[in-house]
Amino acid sequence: MLRLKNDRFIRALLRQPVDRTPVWIMRQAGRYLPEYRQLREKVPNFMAFCKTPELACEATLQPLRRFPLDAAIIFSDILTIPDAMGVDLHIAPTVGPVIRNPVRSAQDVNRLQMPAVEEALSYLFDAIRLAVKALDHRVPLIGFAGSPWTLACYMTEGQSSKTFLTARAMLYQQPDVFHTLLQKLTTLTIAYLNAQIKAGADVVMLFDTWGGLLTPSLYRQFSLDYLSQIAAEVVRQKNGRKIPLIFFTKNGGQWLESIANSGCDAVGLDWTTDIGQARRRVGDRVALQGNLDPAILLSNPESISTAAVDILKSYGQGSGHVFNLGHGIDPSTPIENVAALVEAVQNFSIKNEEPINSYYR
């Protein structure tokens, strides 16, 4: 098994020594890149684009040609699993995801398909294999999925929402039905992530984008318990190498200790949590990822550099930190501001030199 030329990201996730803080950016492959917008012109339909392995691979690689990032993330969408289950998914250009047959009853849940993941989502695994080959062991490749709760939000609401009131109401009105839906999603998510690892993903991440909408009690019952189940059943070693698992719950700072105890290797933070305080709260249980406010990337390089350094100082010395945004990059972000961010993180965080590929031996 060939080792990665740059395993800084994985070492930080496992809280092993690194020469500097690794950096990557959520949604680093996307609309802020002019070359991505040009690529999308070939296949305007978003899901059709995701289902074309060669295009998904190219989108994955594009940000690494511009910026010296420490990881690639496969280009895809969290709604691939609901799509494979038979919901009528449409991505509207100005609206976002729309599900024309929302899941709102026991009958709706029972009608959902439970496909063989490696067949139904083979396009994603083909894209991973292409990306692994193209990366040629330069940096790790991240695979990902949406959390069961977040996927269920879209499936029950029928579209994106700031509140997901329909989904939240169902938790009170039909809790057993909702648990059945979540268990189906959990079963498929485990198979999905394991198939991504089999195809070549070095790290996997779960995006619990809407977990922060829940009460503390409901968060544990309807989100965290299912995340813990995934952590227990996802492959964590392959060919003698550890496969780190990252959990990201937006607005989940109040439950940081519980998330840290859920079985993941690293916890993603949004920008509303102080990373220094977060480090003190979790101790040496998990690594932390984050957590620059994406809005600052719409300002200027000087402000961006200052804010990035503030986060690095707040975290302090030692490993266990992966620099990232607190959520996905905004499509209107200027390219030069992304470059300024990456440069600031790299220049400030350089530590005592040591071999960065010593983990994969």
UniProtKB/Swiss-Prot annotation:
Keyword Cytoplasm included in the entry's annotation: yes
UniProtKB keywords: Cytoplasm, Decarboxylase, Lyase, Porphyrin biosynthesis
Cited CDD domains: URO-D
Site positions for Transition state stabilizer: 77
Residues involved in substrate binding: 27-31, 77, 154, 209, 327
Catalytic activity: uroporphyrinogen III + 4 H(+) = coproporphyrinogen III + 4 CO2
Gene3D superfamilies documented for this protein: 3.20.20.210
Biological processes annotated in GO: protoporphyrinogen IX biosynthetic process from glutamate
GO molecular function annotation: uroporphyrinogen decarboxylase activity
Record-listed E.C. numbers: 4.1.1.37
Subcellular location: Cytoplasm
Protein family: Belongs to the uroporphyrinogen decarboxylase family.
PANTHER family linked to this entry: METHYLTETRAHYDROFOLATE:HOMOCYSTEINE METHYLTRANSFERASE RELATED (PTHR21091), UROPORPHYRINOGEN DECARBOXYLASE (PTHR21091:SF169)
Function: Catalyzes the decarboxylation of four acetate groups of uroporphyrinogen-III to yield coproporphyrinogen-III.
Name listed for the protein in its UniProt record: Uroporphyrinogen decarboxylase
Species of origin: Coxiella burnetii (strain CbuK_Q154) (Coxiella burnetii (strain Q154))
Organism ancestry: Bacteria, Pseudomonadati, Pseudomonadota, Gammaproteobacteria, Legionellales
Gene: hemE
